[in-house]
Amino acid sequence: MTPATQLSARWNGLLPRESLERLDATEFLTRCRQGIASRGVLERFLVQQYHYSRHFTRYLCALLANLASEADRFALTENLFEEMGLGGMGEVPHSQIYRQMLEAFGLEPSAQPPLAETTSLVRNMLRLCSDSDPLVGLGALCLGAEAIVPHVYQQILTGLLSAGFPEKDLIFFPMHIDGDDEHALTMKQIIERELTERPGKRDVLRGAAEEIIEARRAFFAALTVSEAQAASASRRASGAL
């Protein structure tokens, strides 16, 4: 049984197994698992992930705006507070922790603008989370992001450590490997209740999850394409000397 199959099973089939397997099969995640991802492509990931993740509170607020239940909004507000450094996972905003990590590695996001695939991922997540049907936003943000963060980040952390990035500077990843599963389970409870009331909406939920996971797959694929293009440009420049 593949890790993607195991994860999907733990979520009672809510997570699209085929989409997860395609995500795991990307060259980037494969290299991370094998411990052979280059430092260059990992640095590219860290910067592009910043361009995506800095909008996380916008994604969450968009979803919150479409939840009719006050209890549901209250439950997810805890996630928002933690992102802002006001919850139980620490007193520093997560965006600041990420920036500190980039600074430790000498990476400046403004020097590497978002790739087209990164911009597409951001726009798709915002669009789906803003949908008037909360199951669309839950499919994207829960099933397409929070629920798979521990699974994906563990692979990336393996790649970062194998490439020699100091563990002391990588606290952002263990924090989310340990913490995001709880956030996802909070959303899962909302999803299960919504599906009990509206069982015909299961395909809507799954479609949103598949769409955002595919956008994430394209995001990962672009990292190694960019690496190959950079290597090709370097060879051409060397040949011209």
Regions found by a protein language model. Give the residues of each.
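Non-heme di-metal
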Residues: 1-241
